[in-house]
A protein has these predicted regions:
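Bacterial Sec-dependent N-terminal signal peptides
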Residues: 1-28
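Catalytic loop of the DD-peptidase/beta-lactamase superfamily, centered on the K-T-G motif
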Residues: 19-62, 168, 176, 180, ...
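Mobile, glycine-enriched helix-loop/loop "lid" segments at the mouths of ligand-binding/catalytic clefts
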Residues: 198-214
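Secretory-pathway/luminal and periplasmic proteins that interact with or process carbohydrate-rich
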Residues: 58, 116-124, 135-139, 185-195, ...
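Catalytic-site signature segments of enzymes, centered on catalytic residues
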Residues: 131-201, 217-218, 224-240
């Protein structure tokens, strides 16, 4: 009898320890992220890390301050600037007009902006604006094109500015109205167009110098042209909602979504890889290591924000990191974004 009891006890012990170890294996990333951020080296982390899978929150923590001067603690639902993550929203709005037949991706800009003063409007297409092959420089629209349109890659905020002008002209609506409607569609209730009223609810951006001193940016100096591809107000959780709506087929037809997430040009980015990866419409496409990764970064030193939004379609996982600091030392600007990405990619979460 004692032998039978002991055997049953051993079986139960093995079973429950197996369940426990399985549970531990299931989350092999949270403690590593905590430890990484707790080390505060080579710089401190000041922001929110938000990880979601299949609509369920897997990790959500805020570290640091919304205002470094006042030492106001950051909260999970605080609002940050998207920086260039906004480009994918602009791209979706343009593609929705493509589906309506009001915009032709292969048409030159002149077709939609006949009075545009730049000669390159006769040759640069909407497609080239969206995938950064227009030849336009990043922040100076008056400079001659860097190369023949369609022949190379050059990241261009001005390209998205022009795409935004085309969008407003062909839709007959302001970008503010369009993006506000898009936020409602995606139930992004903690996000907004950065008008004067909404901007008051944005966390303060901080520019961190190489000597570790910082400048608190009381007001953002973005003009309307930056909203097309460089600045919208979102919370990390809302950005995860955006990923669900975009990648589930709720915003674009399958063929249109495929256009957005396909690429004909490649480019290097320090966060993703040492090798060139694809650039679609407002999205970087990394298909180099048997784990499709779709995402974009955002960084603005002068306004003081750093962000990354990553999505892994196979496991329906979002990894969102938003900081209200931007470091002048670019070697460490994306340090935590890079390291957290590595932790997640090596974890069981994506398997």
């Amino acid at each position: 009898m004692n032998q039978i009891f002991n055997l049953i006890l051993v079986i139960f012990t093995i079973f429950f320890s197996g369940c426990n170890s399985f549970g531990q294996q299931k989350d092999d990333y949270s403690a590593k992220i905590d430890s990484l951020i707790g080390a505060k080296s080579p710089r401190g982390f000041n922001g929110v890390v938000f990880i979601q899978q299949n609509g369920k929150t897997k990790y959500a923590k805020a570290y640091g301050f919304a205002d470094l001067n006042k030492k106001t603690p950051l909260k999970i639902d605080d609002k940050f600037s998207t920086m260039s993550i906004a480009k994918q929203l602009t791209a979706v709005l343009v593609l929705q007009e493509v589906e309506k037949g009001t915009i032709d991706l292969q048409a030159p800009i002149r077709k939609y902006l006949p009075d545009f003063k730049y000669a390159w409007a006769d040759t640069v297409t909407v497609h080239q604006l969206l995938n950064n092959t227009s030849g336009l420089y990043s922040d100076d629209i008056d400079r001659p094109l860097k190369f023949k349109p369609g022949t190379a890659f050059n990241y261009s905020n001005m390209g998205y500015y022009v795409a935004g002008l085309v969008l407003e002209k062909q839709s007959g609506k302001s970008f503010e109205a369009l993006v506000t409607s898009l936020f409602k569609t995606c139930h992004m209730h903690n996000s907004a167009y950065p008008n004067e009223i909404n901007s008051k609810f944005l966390t303060k951006g901080h520019t961190v110098r190489k000597d570790s001193s910082y400048i608190l940016n009381e007001e953002l100096n973005f003009g309307p042209e930056h909203c097309f591809g460089s600045h919208l107000i979102v919370s990390p959780a809302d950005l995860a909602k955006w990923n669900i709506y975009l990648h589930s087929g709720s915003l674009l037809k399958p063929a249109t979504y495929k256009m957005m997430t396909s690429y004909v040009i490649t480019n290097k980015h320090t966060l993703f890889s040492d090798d060139p990866i694809g650039y679609g419409y407002g999205l970087r496409i990394n298909d180099k290591d048997n784990m499709l990764e779709i995402g974009h970064t955002g960084f603005h030193l002068g306004e003081g924000f750093t962000a990354v939004n990553l999505y892994y379609p196979k496991s329906k996982t979002s990894v969102i990191i938003m900081e209200n600091v931007a470091h002048e030392n670019f070697d460490i600007a994306y340090y935590f974004e890079q390291e957290i990405r590595k932790i997640v990619k090596e974890s069981n979460l994506l398997k």
